[in-house]
């Protein structure tokens, strides 16, 4: 996708404009349809109803066609409503293979240039496939008429690109996106943007005593990786640590998943994808903040060496864990990753994981579940998600749940107290390793993928939380 800003007098193939039921049409748009526009609006040939689209040829040579986007009553249009209008318009153009497009941002409320660039990038994303019959990709060339500077376009395009990177990773099959391949993806990002990168190998983990991460990896023939990225934009300030679960395929181990539940487990590294998407955005936009990214990467397989229910393992923090469910593996890899992140003395820790099926039961597929030990941290993050429309909902992090995680006859903790309240148990387990550090846990198991296409993209991976994470860390500088 290419973005340009040029003189409005240039020749235009398709011009996208907003049209409202209670605001006059700008004269330069009216001039394209001498003595006709008001009549067409009056009889419904051009609709001002919110979400209605009309593509019409013009009566002049400067602009070939105009796509009218109905805004309804413009003052009642929310940011997310506007986002979905742009997404619908972008997909309308894509369906007709109209690739050279000019958008008159001045006809939309507040000239939302960043939102236009972001949404066009998100909504026209194409899922990578591995079919032998290739297809032509939609190569969009967009020009914006606006008083806003290029920086707004760059921000929106960068956030869309970063989100789409996360989408691509979540979609990749587990035989191609192994732990070493995920480490390579991190290396590509680090080299492209100059981030600091460290990759811990299995021997390094053994030396550090990462028994929880290593236990999950025991059944695999593919070695684990602990991926550590650093973005330094604020000197010696303490970093914000972002930890993403990177289980590249999850069989459930000996607590094996059913045949329907195991399909799609290539996407059990959605948290890791969000972290890498964040670092892609940081590299493009360079805010004045320090960010640490930690990704524990492994698959969870079955073999004669795999860990088992009733095993007792020792984490990097020294806490012992009774294994009651080998399919509760995400919290184990996060435990060691969070412990490692604390070595950097971060000002806060945010972890993201496709952690539990329980969050889908509780909140469905539109809302991410959250736990926290810091109300202010949650409130600041929630405020950001209301702008990005990546909704979160805080679940109770209270003693009644914490005590059940600590209930074991043979170890300090157990990894799966039961199914009732399962989402909270998963987060509370991770909370046992954060100590007093301000911490936010995000369970994205319901929001990491969508079962049907929307105005913001095709079915499948969503790249959830990339945009919210970026806006949050930028404001925490």
Curated annotation (Swiss-Prot):
One of its GO terms (biological process) is proteolysis. The active site is at 257, 331. Its EC number is 3.4.11.1, 3.4.11.10. Keywords: Aminopeptidase, Cytoplasm, Hydrolase, Manganese, Metal-binding, Protease. Its cofactor is Mn(2+). Gene3D superfamilies: Leucine Aminopeptidase, subunit E, domain 1, Zn peptidases. Mn(2+) 1 binds at residues 250, 327, 329. Mn(2+) 2 binds at residues 245, 250, 268, 329. GO terms for cellular component: cytoplasm. It is found in: Cytoplasm. One of its GO terms (molecular function) is manganese ion binding. It comes from the Bacteria. It catalyses: Release of an N-terminal amino acid, Xaa-|-Yaa-, in which Xaa is preferably Leu, but may be other amino acids including Pro although not Arg or Lys, and Yaa may be Pro. Amino acid amides and methyl esters are also readily hydrolyzed, but rates on arylamides are exceedingly low; Release of an N-terminal amino acid, preferentially leucine, but not glutamic or aspartic acids. PANTHER family: CYTOSOL AMINOPEPTIDASE (PTHR11963:SF23), LEUCINE AMINOPEPTIDASE-RELATED (PTHR11963). Presumably involved in the processing and regular turnover of intracellular proteins. Catalyzes the removal of unsubstituted N-terminal amino acids from various peptides. Belongs to the peptidase M17 family. This is Probable cytosol aminopeptidase. It comes from Exiguobacterium sibiricum (strain DSM 17290 / CCUG 55495 / CIP 109462 / JCM 13490 / 255-15).
